[in-house]
A protein has these predicted regions:
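Phosphate-end processing signature that detects enzymes handling 5′-triphosphorylated RNA
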Residues: 1-225
Length: 225
């Protein structure tokens, strides 16, 4: 997996501000090419942690450099599943991502035969299991993504954040989940490479927002305690 590192800043905004911001973003940025007709896609992620929940506690403690793993797919489509390693170093985030099959994803969860494959991705998943990483929590949300080529900018608005303990089929579209964000809230994320272009910065400055170290993973675990 090849890592891509970039700036990542997160905010909590109101749903009202989210609607206004989507309107403004459409005038300057392009929607991600993979969105549905309404400009969004549905994301399901399964986060892993070890038996001591190290990834969770490092985030809560504010450890500067930390790592977590997840399996992710979109719109409940199992034809494109990714295994992702997310790393954080202050305001910088990195992501390494590889495509895996549904068979391999399910084998990781059950310890199935596919993990004995010699393929690199299978070996990576087998190594995670051997090191004690296990499914921790299911995270669902709807994302409205926008891109701007200069600075490789990506602005996303996440709504309908919901969670469940992982006790079900990862691909069950009727999994019983509970809401995580306070009513009327959304998450705004801004990612870019070396700099944030002035037009995008000016657009975002017009939004009432509260910067915070939002972690969907830790928020979801907290809700389930």
């Amino acid at each position: 997996m090849a890592e891509i590192k970039r700036h990542e800043i997160k905010y909590i905004i109101s749903l009202r501000e989210a609607e206004l911001l989507k309107y403004r973003l459409r005038a300057l940025l392009r929607p991600d090419p993979h969105v549905r007709a309404d400009g969004s896609y549905f994301i399901r992620s399964l986060y892993f942690d070890d038996t001591d929940y190290r990834a969770y506690h490092e985030k809560i403690a504010g450890v500067k450099e930390r790592t977590k793993y997840r399996i992710r797919f979109y719109n409940m489509d199992d034809s494109r599943i990714t295994l992702e390693k997310k790393s954080k170093d202050g305001d910088f985030s990195g992501k390494e991502s590889v495509r895996i099959s549904r068979e391999l994803a399910e084998a990781f969860l059950t310890g199935g035969e596919a993990l004995r494959d010699t393929e690199e991705h299978a070996r990576e998943l087998a190594r995670l299991r051997q090191n004690g990483w296990k499914p921790a929590v299911l995270v669902d949300y709807v994302r409205y993504p926008f891109v701007y080529p200069t600075g490789n900018v990506r602005v996303t608005i996440d709504t309908e954040l919901r969670t469940a303990p992982f006790k079900t089929n990862l691909f069950d579209d009727r999994a019983l989940t509970v809401p995580v964000l306070d009513e009327g809230e959304a998450v705004l994320e801004v990612k870019y490479d070396a700099f944030l272009p002035a037009p995008v910065r000016a657009l975002l400055e017009g939004v009432t927002k509260q910067r915070c170290a939002v972690s969907k993973y830790t928020k979801c675990l907290d809700i389930l305690e």
